[in-house]
């Protein structure tokens, strides 16, 4: 059950914050001495997505995940937008070494690396160092987006990328998003059937799944083995009336699992036994709560949803 303060913060983010930009919060670095939480029993592997705590460095995201009680963390090697803080994350860099040191010190594992946008000019060979770095960190999943209007070319490039990534033990899952050229689960299923690669997958995220009017049967009809992991958050009942609004909400005003309008218990029935990445970025909460406290709140709420789904 959410406290009154937490419900107020969630509501504020869902209403006043949904349609206006929020300023970036200034927060102190996370340390292992910040706070002591009671251990949580995780029914599945649960990862802290990079976007959820993008206001701290990748190295501090590892510490945040560890202190909050996550089993895994997501690492953003390549920025998703030009406005976010840039880190040197490919190869043997100081930040990569700091991330490695924190992984070793905490025992947290890397679930996924991001983001690989498949564009018209994408060439698989140019992503070799990205895959090498991901393998170095122990990642098993790569978050991809389909950003090429020529679906045949996108499909060919995706197949080549999967082939290049396979020796590194990496699965490449395209995340269907309403504003991308690969926008639905059904469409990604068609691409998966064409390329027939064992390390190709479909990444389901509730905010995109429901905003693009996907159907549960589209998940069930994916080729066997296509679901490698999933993302979880919650959403407002009110849907933005423009694509820009949908995109802005997805990047800035997601809700904590189980506190919004999405039927996550039903969705989880179609995503059984998968590792979960909590991607619940919320710009308003970032102004009032530390990255660590947000991460812990999201984890507690996610475990509550899993328990409600009969997973303990």
Language model regions located:
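Glycine-rich, proline-tolerant flexible connector loops at the mouths of alpha/beta enzymes
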Residues: 74-98
């Amino acid at each position: 059950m959410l406290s009154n303060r937490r419900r107020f913060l969630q509501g504020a983010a869902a209403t006043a914050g949904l349609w206006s930009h929020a300023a970036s919060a200034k927060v102190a670095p996370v340390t292992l001495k910040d706070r002591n939480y009671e251990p949580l029993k995780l029914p599945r592997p649960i990862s802290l997505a990079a976007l959820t705590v993008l206001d701290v460095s990748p190295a501090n995201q590892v510490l945040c995940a560890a202190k909050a009680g996550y089993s895994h963390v997501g690492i953003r090697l390549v920025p998703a937008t030009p406005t976010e803080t840039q880190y040197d994350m490919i190869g043997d860099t100081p930040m990569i070494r700091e991330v490695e040191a924190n992984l070793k010190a905490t025992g947290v594992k890397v679930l996924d690396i991001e983001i690989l946008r498949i564009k018209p000019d994408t060439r698989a060979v140019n992503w070799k160092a990205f895959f090498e770095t991901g393998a170095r960190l122990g990642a098993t999943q790569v978050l991809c987006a389909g950003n090429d209007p020529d679906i045949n070319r996108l499909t060919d490039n995706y197949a080549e990328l999967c082939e290049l990534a396979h020796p590194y033990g990496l699965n490449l899952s395209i995340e269907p998003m309403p504003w991308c050229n690969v926008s639905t689960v059904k469409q990604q299923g068609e691409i998966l059937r064409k390329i027939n690669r064992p390390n190709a997958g479909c990444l389901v995220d509730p905010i995109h799944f429901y905003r693009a009017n996907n159907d549960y049967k589209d998940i069930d009809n994916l080729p066997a083995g296509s679901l490698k992991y999933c993302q979880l958050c919650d959403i407002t009942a009110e849907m933005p009336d423009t694509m820009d609004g949908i995109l802005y909400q997805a990047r800035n005003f997601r809700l904590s699992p189980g506190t919004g309008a999405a039927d996550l218990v039903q969705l989880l029935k179609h995503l059984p036994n998968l590792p979960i990445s909590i991607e619940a970025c919320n710009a308003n909460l970032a102004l009032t709560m530390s990255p660590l406290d947000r991460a812990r709140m999201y984890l507690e709420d996610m475990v509550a949803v899993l328990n409600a789904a009969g997973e303990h």
